[in-house]
């Protein structure tokens, strides 16, 4: 029984570390989203003719981003850009735009 205590403590530390790792730094997400400004405008407020992202549903934006990434949605550049992010990063970006005021 005594030898299981250090093992249990090590497992608990690993689990806690994984949970902390899952959190994304808000400044990092903002930095990722800044890459979208050329086409979608500052903070997702686009000029006419381009889709605005500010205030859009996180779920809908994420769905589109994942479709671009998988090549299921036609695009000029989005299919290339979205492949540079993990699904978790795309989810964080979609949430960031959802939180912006239109």
Role assignments for model-derived ranges:
Residues 1-8:
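Bacterial N-terminal signal peptides that target proteins for export
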Residues 23, 42, 81, 96-98:
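Residue-level hotspots at or immediately adjacent to binding/recognition sites across diverse folds
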Residues 29, 43-73, 79-85:
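Gly/Gly-Pro-rich "capping" loops immediately C-terminal to redox-active cysteine motifs
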Residues 34-42, 93:
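The canonical Cys-X-X-Cys-His
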Residues 38, 70, 99-102:
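Residue-level marker of structural boundaries
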Residues 83-102:
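C-terminal capping alpha-helices of c-type cytochrome domains
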Residues 13-33, 51, 62, 67, ...:
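Electrostatic cytochrome c docking/interface patches
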């Amino acid at each position: 029984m005594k030898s299981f205590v250090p093992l249990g403590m090590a497992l608990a530390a690993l689990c806690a570390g994984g949970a902390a790792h899952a959190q994304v730094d808000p400044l990092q997400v903002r930095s990722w989203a800044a890459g979208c400004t050329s086409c979608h405008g500052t903070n997702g407020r686009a000029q006419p003719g381009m889709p605005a992202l500010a205030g859009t549903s996180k779920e809908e934006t994420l769905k589109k981003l994942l479709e671009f990434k998988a090549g299921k949605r036609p695009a000029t550049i989005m299919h290339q850009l979205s492949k540079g992010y993990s699904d978790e990063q795309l989810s964080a970006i979609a949430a960031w735009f959802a939180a912006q005021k239109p």
